[in-house]
């Protein structure tokens, strides 16, 4: 156990890949190793790259890695992919996405399947980020699966969220307002060489101007890029750096760390508590009667849940 943790702290990528696989499969051994690694985490700058399908996130990310490496920063990537309906594994392999970086020891790329988890992330994204953090990567990028407005979960997992759009989206920019526009720290208009790019910038700027906030709050920049040839990538990395500096100077960097850890802790408590509760209920007649009444619609799900919680509270 200690040997595996030591290998990961030394940056062993094979050991890290094995651990992430154990965590994806919810193996107790993996959790024990992660417990040993946890005191060595909390140092990485964690970025989220999100946006609707087809905006070029993966191509943009490949150039971002190059620019971060030119600045002598080690980069870890968690690329969340759709799940195979047969194997449950990621449909897109990391070598297909960012092939040229696979031989760079300063880069570690891990594709993870959503496995039915909503919100644009894999259920074990947070665990994978902790592993990369413990390995000493300076920057960790989470690329979401690309399901559009439902990807707001990424904002709870990172320090800085970049939302990518492109010309020709039309009404989709309006649809983003209730979701992605609310969580973005940086906005990227990719394929900016296409007609309509300036119109998208104007739409985004208009919507961002409608966001309320104090004069001292961060004003999200809008960066135009052409990911296929790397245009605008330097400006985007500069924007990431500027936002990090803003977070550190205002104390919000530590605040976001605390919030991330609290949400992770809360998720684990909810999962463990639910498992423990239902494991102990199966043989209770009152519980079986409650489920029967729910199935036959003699009681609604809300009332059934309230009844169950009240019963648990009485026993605590």
Task: Annotate each PLM feature.
Residues 52:
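P-loop (Walker A) phosphate-binding loop of NTP-binding proteins
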Residues 224, 235-312:
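Long, well-ordered amphipathic alpha-helical subdomains in the mid-to-C-terminal portions
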Residues 2-5, 112, 187-189, 221-226, ...:
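Short hinge/gating elements
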Residues 186, 192-249:
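Canonical P-loop GTPase G-domain recognition
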Residues 91, 128, 153, 157, ...:
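Alpha-helical scaffold elements adjacent to nucleotide-binding pockets in ATP/GTP-utilizing enzyme cores
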Residues 3-47, 55, 64-150, 157-164, ...:
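Nucleotide-state-sensitive switch-loop elements of NTP-binding domains
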Residues 156-174, 185, 189-198:
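Conserved Switch II/interswitch segment of TRAFAC-class P-loop GTPases
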Residues 60:
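Hydrophobic positions on the alpha1 helix immediately C-terminal to the Walker A/P-loop
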């Amino acid at each position: 156990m200690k040997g595996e943790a030591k290998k990961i702290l030394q940056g062993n990528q094979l050991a890290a890949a094995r651990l992430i696989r154990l965590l994806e499969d919810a193996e107790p051994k993996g959790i024990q190793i992660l417990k040993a690694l946890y005191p060595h985490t909390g140092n990485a700058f964690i970025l989220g790259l999100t946006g609707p399908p087809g905006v070029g996130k993966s191509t943009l990310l490949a150039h971002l890695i190059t620019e971060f490496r030119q600045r002598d920063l080690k980069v870890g990537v968690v690329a969340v992919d759709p799940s195979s309906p047969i194997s449950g594994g990621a449909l897109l392999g990391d070598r297909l996405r960012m092939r040229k970086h696979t031989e760079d020891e300063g880069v570690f790329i891990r594709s993870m399947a959503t496995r039915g988890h909503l919100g644009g992330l894999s259920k074990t994204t947070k665990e994978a980020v902790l592993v990369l953090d413990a390995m000493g990567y300076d920057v960790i990028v989470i690329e979401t699966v690309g399901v559009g407005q439902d990807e707001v979960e990424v904002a709870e997992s990172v320090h800085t969220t970049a939302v990518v759009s492109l010309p020709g989206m039309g009404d989709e920019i309006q649809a983003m307002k209730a979701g992605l526009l609310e969580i973005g720290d940086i906005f990227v208009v990719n394929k900016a060489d296409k007609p309509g790019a300036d119109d998208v910038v104007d739409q985004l700027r208009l919507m961002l101007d409608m966001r309320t906030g104090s004069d001292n709050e961060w004003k999200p920049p809008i960066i135009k890029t052409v990911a296929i040839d790397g245009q605008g990538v330097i400006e985007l990395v500069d924007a990431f750096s500027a936002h990090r500096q803003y977070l550190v100077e205002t104390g919000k960097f530590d605040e976001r760390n605390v919030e991330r850890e609290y949400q992770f802790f809360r998720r684990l408590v909810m999962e463990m508590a639910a498992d423990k509760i239902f494991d102990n209920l199966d043989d209770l007649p009152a519980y079986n009667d409650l489920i029967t009444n729910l199935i036959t619609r003699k009681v609604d799900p809300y009332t059934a849940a309230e009844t169950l919680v009240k019963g648990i509270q009485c026993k605590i």
